[in-house]
Amino acid sequence: MSQLFQKEITTATEDEMPYSHCMIRIHKNGDSVHVHRDNCNFEMPDYVVSKYQNQLSAILYLQSPRTGGELKIYDKQWSLPDESQRHPEFGYSSSVTDGSNYAVVSPIAGNLLVLNPNFYHQIEPVLGTKHRISIGFFFAESTDDKLFKWS
């Protein structure tokens, strides 16, 4: 990422404590993630990372499942009225994306995906005994033109 953006990437901190560098996700047979978005500008207004604009999410696929586990990315970004369709625990009603076009990304080991986390997305069910394994993190520019990553 440093070479791509020609900037040094620094791990974001909160009260002088660093965020994790990345998150390892293991999705097993039957696992899925319903419609959601990940941008923390609205979710976490008191946190330093919520102040970073133009946030992006990076996902590196380490292992592909035999079947399933595709990432479905909808051509719809979050807006405040969508909060009426929010699930109390996590994510949104699938109706929030009704009528939206979408792209499907297969989780192919070795592929790196960078996306705008403000677009709604979901993970289709993994089928079979081979797990879907990925590493993910967020990154963004600060107002003083520095690049930060966190998870």
What function would you assign to each model-found segment?
Residues 22, 54-56, 111, 133:
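Residue-level detector of short, conserved catalytic/binding motifs and their immediate flanks
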Residues 1-29, 46-47:
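Signature of the catalytic double-stranded beta-helix
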Residues 26, 62, 125-127:
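Short, low-complexity Ser/Thr-rich regulatory SLiMs
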Residues 26-28, 75, 117, 137:
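Pocket-edge structural micro-motifs
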Residues 24, 58-60, 135-139:
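A structural signal for short, well-ordered beta-strand segments
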Residues 83-151:
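Catalytic core of Fe(II)/2-oxoglutarate
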Residues 29-107, 148:
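Catalytic core of non-heme Fe(II) oxygenases with the double-stranded beta-helix
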Residues 15-16, 68, 127-129:
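A short beta-turn/loop motif at secondary-structure boundaries
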